[in-house]
């Protein structure tokens, strides 16, 4: 009966512990290990059959967007020459991405027009990652592949459009195939590899890099958190302390990874944009 109850609610990882409060080691119940079921959610509204529903990740994505817009609106709605604390924090974040990522990768003159896109991507990705360690939410939206895929698609379309606009069809062809006549007889093979790398592998890896890191990080956090509770019985208590310490350590590490992955995502975005504007020789 206990196993059936756990299976019934396992779609929501935030409910695992709540429905297994009397399940500890040596009690005869199995360890409620995290898995793919930890990333599946029942609709908060609607149903899966109709493909029209609203679930927890969607809610977090919406709330995250509102938080970001609200933060910058509050910081810049009445900008001051001598900035207050909120404006100072917002300016520091904005300026870090503008100067440290966009200007350094694309250049000041060409990059200025892409600052809004890159800043928006950075803070959105970062916020979606941060949900993983925020109480009650405790789920990184970017651990669901659809979200990184859409963001990567936006960058991909921007890159293709910009390449066509700046270099024309011939320039686009040379750009995506890495055309270099000095390669001689291996040129056809090199062009084929480069074509698949740019057209298929590039957007795939751009999305999967973010998704895989958030998926793995959340799984580890769930594992140590659940283990801390599960081991609270008999001699297992000693190991529960170790698991709890690992939960704290992994949370701190995950906080670093969340910011790093947001940074890497926009850094690659700027690299692709810069490559689209660079004339291929």
Swiss-Prot record:
Compartment(s): Cell membrane
Keyword Zinc: no
Superkingdom to which the source organism belongs: Bacteria
One term under GO cellular component: plasma membrane
SUPFAM superfamilies: F1F0 ATP synthase subunit A
Database matches in InterPro entries: ATP_synth_F0_asu, ATP_synth_F0_asu_AS, ATP_synth_F0_asu_bact/mt, F0_ATP_A_sf
UniProt key word Protease: no
UniProt topology in membrane: Multi-pass membrane protein
GO molecular function term, any single one: proton-transporting ATP synthase activity, rotational mechanism
Keywords, ordered alphabetically: ATP synthesis, Cell membrane, CF(0), Hydrogen ion transport, Ion transport, Membrane, Transmembrane, Transmembrane helix, Transport
TM segment ranges: 56-76, 117-137, 144-164, 181-201, 215-235, 237-257, 259-279
Family indicated by similarity: Belongs to the ATPase A chain family.
UniProt function note: Key component of the proton channel; it plays a direct role in the translocation of protons across the membrane.
Subunit structure: F-type ATPases have 2 components, CF(1) - the catalytic core - and CF(0) - the membrane proton channel. CF(1) has five subunits: alpha(3), beta(3), gamma(1), delta(1), epsilon(1). CF(0) has three main subunits: a(1), b(2) and c(9-12). The alpha and beta chains form an alternating ring which encloses part of the gamma chain. CF(1) is attached to CF(0) by a central stalk formed by the gamma and epsilon chains, while a peripheral stalk is formed by the delta and b chains.
NCBIfam families, sorted: ATP_synt_6_or_A
Protein name according to UniProt: ATP synthase subunit a
The species this protein was found in: Streptomyces lividans
Gene name of the record: atpB
């Amino acid at each position: 009966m206990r196993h059936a109850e756990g299976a019934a609610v396992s779609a929501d990882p935030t409910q695992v512990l709540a429905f297994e409060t009397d399940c500890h080691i040596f009690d005869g119940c199995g360890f409620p290990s995290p898995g793919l079921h930890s990333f599946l959610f029942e609709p908060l509204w609607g149903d899966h059959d109709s493909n029209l529903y609203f679930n927890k990740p969607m809610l977090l994505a919406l709330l995250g967007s509102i938080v970001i817009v609200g933060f910058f609106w509050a910081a810049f709605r009445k900008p001051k020459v001598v900035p207050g604390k909120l404006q100072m924090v917002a300016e520091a974040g904005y300026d870090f991405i503008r100067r440290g990522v966009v200007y350094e990768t694309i250049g000041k003159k060409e990059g200025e027009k892409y600052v809004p896109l890159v800043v928006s991507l950075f803070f959105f990705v970062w916020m979606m990652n941060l949900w993983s360690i925020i109480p009650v939410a405790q789920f990184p939206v970017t651990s669901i592949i659809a979200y990184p895929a859409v963001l990567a698609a936006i960058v991909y379309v921007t890159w293709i459009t910009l390449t066509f606009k700046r270099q024309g069809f011939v320039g686009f062809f040379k750009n995506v195939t890495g055309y270099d006549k000095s390669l001689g007889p291996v040129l056809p093979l090199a062009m084929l590899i480069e074509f698949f790398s740019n057209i298929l592998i590039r957007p795939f890896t751009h999305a999967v890099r973010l998704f895989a890191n958030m998926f793995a990080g959340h799984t580890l956090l769930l594992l140590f958190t659940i283990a801390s509770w599960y081991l609270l019985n008999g001699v297992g208590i000693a190991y529960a302390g170790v698991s709890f310490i690992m939960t704290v350590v992994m949370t701190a590490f995950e906080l670093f990874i969340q910011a790093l992955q947001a940074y890497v995502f926009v850094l690659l975005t700027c690299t692709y944009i810069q490559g689209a504007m660079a004339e291929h020789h």
